[in-house]
């Protein structure tokens, strides 16, 4: 709270090409079945990518859904998140841009802005931890927790029901 976060830098005026481009694979060489190729067409209508799309998504969020963000973000049947995760992950928008948009929304009295800012800080904190402690990606914070005595008996009725999507809890079984 009350920490200074620098304004986002503008786009660089020039980017140098790498000395050697990385190897790449052609999707056609993956020998995927027809069902997988069909999936591409289904996903394409939902994948809105690029910096302009990310900026538009952020603008729509802070002018609308941010007001209910505190409660709606936790409800799976509500469209209550910022939907910016993929844009942040791919670098189409930066956390500083989101931070300053959140600050402006908070200053305008939008109810969910403070929660949005906190969630953004938690996201960046988690990435910071993973960068400086890479084992967290596949292990526990404390290594002794790796020996936790989980109930792994596959004969348990609960495990079998979960594996088959038959727990009786619609959200879990979906």
What are these language model-derived features?
Residues 1-144:
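Glycine/tryptophan-enriched, flexible segments
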Residues 160, 164-174:
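Helix-hairpin-helix/helix-loop-helix acidic hairpins
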Residues 139-151, 157-163:
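Conserved oxyanion/phosphate-binding beta-strand-loop segments in alpha/beta enzyme cores
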């Amino acid at each position: 709270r009350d920490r200074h976060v620098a304004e986002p830098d503008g786009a660089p005026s020039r980017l140098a090409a790498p000395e050697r481009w990385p190897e790449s694979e052609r999707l056609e060489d993956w020998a995927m079945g027809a069902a997988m190729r069909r999936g591409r067409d289904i996903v394409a209508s939902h994948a809105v990518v690029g910096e302009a799309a990310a900026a538009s998504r952020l603008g729509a969020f802070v002018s609308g859904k941010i007001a209910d963000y505190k409660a709606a973000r936790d409800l799976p049947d509500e469209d209550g998140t910022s939907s910016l995760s993929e844009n942040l992950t791919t670098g189409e928008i930066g956390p500083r841009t989101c931070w300053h948009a959140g600050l402006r929304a908070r200053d305008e009295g939008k109810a969910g802005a403070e929660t949005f800012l906190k969630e953004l800080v938690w996201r960046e904190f988690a990435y910071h931890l993973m960068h400086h402690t890479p084992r967290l990606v596949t292990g526990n914070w404390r290594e002794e927790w790796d020996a936790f005595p989980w109930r792994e008996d596959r004969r348990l009725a609960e495990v079998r029901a979960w594996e088959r999507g038959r727990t009786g809890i619609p959200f879990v079984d979906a």
